[in-house]
Amino acid sequence: MGGIAINPDNTISGQVLETLNNYPELLRQKPPGTVLHRVQPSRYDANPVHYRADYRADSDTRYADPARQIGVYSLGFTAEVAVAESFQPGQGIDDQTVSLWRLKQASLHRLKAARVLNLVDVAALANRATHHKVRDIVQARGEGREGYALTQKSSQACMDIRKVDGLLYPSAVYMVTGSMQGCNLVLFEGRECQVDVVSHQLVMEPLLSNGETAAEFLESLGVVLE
């Protein structure tokens, strides 16, 4: 990835781009046909691929564009991680429940990569970063604008690289060591077609790969459904 321009007026952006420039192996490629999964309200079944830029100002979306100009589209590499990421109570709030009604009104979409996807490996970025602030960016936790300000700025820096389709990152709620099964990706708007739609079902209908329903799977993760 040699030749990436670094903006000296933006410290966070500069550090991220410098790290990517020094370590081109941080850009991972996923081949065409890679199966991906997404959970979203069933009312969007007719048009499931929608890149959102209009997150509220205090959004807790970790990798959204802070300028809200470029939309993002989040997916999971397995149905399990897509379900786990979509039905979690508010972070930092104990004993909060997830409504069973939400599960009944949601669909699980199956998609596939339309072409090679070039994704920045966020975990590898953390390992390779030589500046402390970059580590803070990719490991940040928190709620709302302050908690995710650094992660969103790092995402914004990657959005400026046209060859980058998005980010690859491990799930914080469904971790599978050494496997893509516990990973997510967020795709950036404005690139050549990235995904094709395959099929969808109501979240409550299919059995997951381990034989559990979505409700049983979430309960096994400690999510309280009501």
Label every model-predicted segment.
Residues 2-62, 91-226:
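Active-site and NAD+-binding cores of ADP-ribose-processing enzymes
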Residues 61-94:
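Extended catalytic/binding region for NAD+/ADP-ribose chemistry, centered on the ART fold
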